[in-house]
Amino acid sequence: MAQDIWFADSETFAHDNLWVFKRQRDGRTISIWNDTESIKDFIAAYNPILCGYNFRDYDSYILKAVLLDWCPEDIKIVNDTIIASHDDKTVVWGLFNGQPWVELPPIIDLFHDIVPRKGLKEIEANIGMSIVESSVPFDVDRPLTDTERVDVFRYCVHECLPVLCP
C-alpha cells in the first residue's frame, strides 16, 4: 500500500486525549477522542507517514502510550512528565520501563528542520496565519464538555495547518 503523509497533532487533558490527522494529498481530516483501538485501526488502514511539529519530542511519546492502550489519565502523566522533564527524555522513557516495544509509523518532525528553533505560534505569525488558541485550560481536572471538545478540535486542526504544505 502506498503511504500518504498525514499531518498530526494531539492534545492531552486529565481525562481526554484527542488526535487529529489531516492527509496532505486531499485534506481529509480524521479526529479520534479517547479511543486507542481507533488509533490502531487508523494506522493499520492508512499506513501513514506522520508529520508534525515537535512530534518526536512530544507526540511520539503520547502515541506510544496510546498504542499501549493506556487510559487518558495515564497519558496525561506522560504529557506532564514531558513538560516537567525539560528535554530530559530519560525521565520520559522511564515511564515505559517494562512495557512491550511499540512500532510507531514513520515520523517527519519539522521542528528539527528549522534553525534557529522557532515555536509553532511564531511560524504561524511569520506565514501570515491567525494565531488560534484553545479557551480550554490544559489543567482542567474533569472530562471535557461537548462545547470544550469542539473548541479543542478547532485548535488541534489549526495546529496541523502550518506544517501542511500547499
Segments (PLM) and residue ranges:
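Two-metal-ion RNase H-like nuclease active-site motif
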Residues: 3-12, 108-109
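Short N-terminal binding/cap micro-motifs at the start of the first secondary-structure element
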Residues: 14-19
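Short, acidic/hydrophobic/Gly-rich beta-strand patch recurrent on exposed beta strands
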Residues: 22
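Acidic, Mg2+-coordinating catalytic module of metal-dependent nucleases/exonucleases
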Residues: 111-166
